[in-house]
Regions:
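Basic, polyanion-binding surface patches
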Residues: 1-209
Length: 209
């Protein structure tokens, strides 16, 4: 079955995140995005792909700051509220009944109750013929909800249930990861069986890993 361009998105499960920003007048905005991806390892940069006419993009251009929050699958209803095309003067936290999670470095808050929060500053914008924008953000702080960290220091994804979206012909299906029982170390991807980025945990006293 060959798929036309507007049907191809049904083939790839996509992450669901909430991006929160402040307008230059201080109005809080939050919007769902799935077209996001980290830029290689170590995870210092993240890319967001956006339509041109988005309040999120305008706010990032104006303030150079944003927060990416990773919601649980239980937050789909609130997420859908933020997907609507409200006026830029509307506080979307209030519309979706979302509580802010205070940031430590940037001004926009994250979304409370999420799995993780990435505080970001604008590194670069790549504008493609005024059709879409690629936002490159530098992660200046990343915090994970302690509730979802297992004894190995990994994300307990079956407990956290990070929301995943799969597009269909008439709408979106939401699900979350389930472990298959398979685990592979990063070193298995290298011929010398050494992961060049494995440096161990950072200073535990600082709370940074």
């Amino acid at each position: 079955l060959e798929l036309k361009p507007n049907k191809r998105e049904i083939t790839i499960p996509m992450p669901l995140v909430l991006i929160s920003t402040l307008s230059k007048n201080g109005v809080r905005n939050v919007a769902p995005y799935s077209n996001v991806m980290p830029i290689l390892r170590p995870w210092d940069l993240i890319a967001i792909f956006s339509w041109i006419k988005r309040d999120t993009l305008n706010n990032i251009r104006d303030t150079k700051e944003f927060v990416i929050s990773v919601p649980t699958a239980d937050m789909v209803n609130e997420t859908m509220v933020t997907s609507k095309n409200y006026s830029p003067t509307v506080d979307e936290f209030e519309m979706a009944n979302l509580k802010p999670y205070p940031s430590k470095i940037v001004k926009p808050p994250g979304v409370a109750g999420c799995i993780a929060w990435m505080e970001c500053v604008l590194e670069k914008e790549i504008l493609e013929e005024n059709k879409y924008s690629i936002i490159i953000g530098k992660i200046v702080r990343l915090e994970i909800n302690d509730e979802y960290v297992n004894k190995n220091g990994d994300l307990d994804f079956e407990k956290a249930k990070p929301a995943v979206m799969i597009c269909g012909n008439r709408g979106m299906y939401f699900t979350f990861p389930k472990w298959t029982g398979e685990f592979r170390e990063y070193s298995e991807m290298f011929l010398n069986s050494k992961d060049p980025l494995s440096g161990g945990d950072a200073d535990e006293d600082s709370g940074v890993r």
